[in-house]
Structure formats: C-alpha cells, structure tokens
Amino acid sequence: MNTFRLESHLRDYLAQNLGLFSLPDAGLALYKSEDGTVRGVEFQTEVGPIDILAVAANGTLYVIELKVSRGADATVGQVLRYMGAVRKNVAKGRPVFGVIVAAALTEKLKMALSEVKGKVFAIEYELKVSLKQHGHEV
C-alpha cells in the first residue's frame, strides 16, 4: 500500500510540509486570518471545508483539496466552489488557484482539468518509507 489510510493523515503531513509543493508561486504557508484566529487547515466556507488553504509569499492563495486514493473528476467542481468562496470572502483581489492532490489521477479527472488549465493544478503523491540500520550489527 503506497497511500495514506486517512485523508487527515495526508492533510496534516502536507500542512506541515508545504515546501514540498512545486507551484508557480514560492513560499507557501498556511493561511492565517488577520487576527490570527483562523488557520488554513479545514478552513470553513459556506460551501464546505477546504482541506488546506495556503498563501504564497506574494499573497496568492491556493485551495488544496486532498484525495487519499484516486481523484475523481467531480473533485474539479468541488475545488472551483471552494475557489469561488475564497475569492468572495478572503482574497481581497489576490489571485486564487486550486490544487488537487491524489494518489492517482483518473483519465476523467485529467479531461476535466484540461478545461481549467492554469487555474487548477493536479499533483500525484507517492508514499515512501525507508529505514536505515544504525548501531548494533546483528
């Protein structure tokens, strides 16, 4: 098995390792409200919770939607809804992009993404674990 068992595990790992993302804008950090009370993990909107809301060093906002297994084409509509909510309530004129992270991208998802090229990015993740023996030889 090379996927996360629970979406919350993937979310927590990526929220702590936003530097792993290779996106057009550098310096991703978790979104924080101006008063610091709202964080970008499970960010609540009127259309549902966003897995991760991140902001780049230049202020660009990224709506990150996670799928622990295969990303379905319906995920594109979900991300677009979230992007609309962020644009309406948070962005204050800043650019908003979407990111779908999944263990595998289906052909239907790739087809749907072809219509929002440059606005929604898709990333496949791969889980790897390696162990190194140190200390006592057996």
Residue ranges and their predicted role:
Residues 1-138:
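Charged, terminal alpha-helix-loop-beta segments
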